[in-house]
Amino acid sequence: MKAVIADGQNGVEVISDAPKPTPEKGEFLGRVIRVAFNPIDWKTLYNASIEKGTVGGTDFVAVVEDVGEGVDRSKYIGATVSGWAPGPLDGSNAAWREYITLDVNLVYFVPKNITPSQAATLPLTFTTASQGLNQYLGLPLPPTDGSKNSAQQKWVLVWSGSSSVGQYVVQLAHHAGYKVIATCSPHNFDWIKKLGADFTVDYHDPNVVEIIKKATDDSVFYGFDAASFPETSTLAVKAFSSKVKDGKLINILSSPPSPRSEVKIIGIIDYSLFNREFNFFGNKIEPIQASYDHAVEVYKKLTGWLQEGVIIPNRVKEFDGGLQAIPKALREFASGKHSAVKFVVRID
């Protein structure tokens, strides 16, 4: 079986003798037809400390060919599903290979109204967005009966609204009934507003904090920093309302000190939803049952949200060529010379 692995020289290579996995109890075996890139893919594989031979890849779309014990064959065999695997943090269960196995509860069925490439843009970053906004901040998920959540006067600030995570945070916050203000580059303003932002701000503007406060009438009470750099989190916290008593800003991976005591920065790690422990370059990531339960609930509802147009996938930059195309495409992705698009490689 072909797979893409770390080459031990801060790069990746394609091999043809990787072992084909076998589904265990509660799992499926799928033939991978699409993979999408996330920053963790290149940041872990382009790293001298990663073990040579580690298989890469997180987001995938696959056609189910077999299932393990306890899985309804009539429901899954032949179905097209999408999810994300632990990837480089667990090289034995990663997406950049011809076949993949995973817990059937951690994938969603791809609806007919979106393409496999669009489907590949969702799993990891949508999970991250929902984990932060819905699980940790407690904002309601979009209804599944066509109704709408009650409108709120409070604002949610999304820093880096045009990132893959940010685009899904904007949509989830909008459907939660909150007003949304997002930072991004001006050329992405229209797209981010289409996704649900009420106001967009150029994050390059030296007066970005003051602009946010004025646009929201000093009413930002929740925030999500999808960039999660120390400087972006600091600016985001400063933009919170002067009236806030218990503000919360979601940060991906870490919980840096907050410049305001009344605003807490909450670090989230989406790998906690897997039922095992990970070592993230010396930092232990332990499983959290609530994160698994939340992911299962979200994946059950995601197919319907996509069918109804409640959730819009990221825009796609697609690469042909199968697994052999990944090394070159990954280098382009790592260069950072792209905006508001998800890199997807066709494997079939």
Swiss-Prot record:
InterPro entries: ADH-like_C (IPR013149), GroES-like_sf (IPR011032), NAD(P)-bd_dom_sf (IPR036291), PKS_ER (IPR020843), Trans-enoyl_RdTase-like (IPR047122)
SUPFAM superfamilies given in the database record: GroES-like, NAD(P)-binding Rossmann-fold domains
Keyword 4Fe-4S: no
Pfam families for the chain: ADH_zinc_N
Keywords: Mitochondrion, Oxidoreductase
EC category name: oxidoreductase
EC number: 1.-.-.-
An MF annotation (GO) of this entry: oxidoreductase activity, acting on NAD(P)H
A GO-annotated cellular component: mitochondrion
Compartments in which it is found: Mitochondrion
Assigned protein family: Belongs to the zinc-containing alcohol dehydrogenase family. Quinone oxidoreductase subfamily.
Cited PANTHER family: HYPOTHETICAL OXIDOREDUCTASE (EUROFUNG), ZINC-TYPE ALCOHOL DEHYDROGENASE-LIKE PROTEIN C2E1P3.01
Protein's recorded name: Zinc-type alcohol dehydrogenase-like protein C2E1P3.01
Organism expressing this protein natively: Schizosaccharomyces pombe (strain 972 / ATCC 24843)
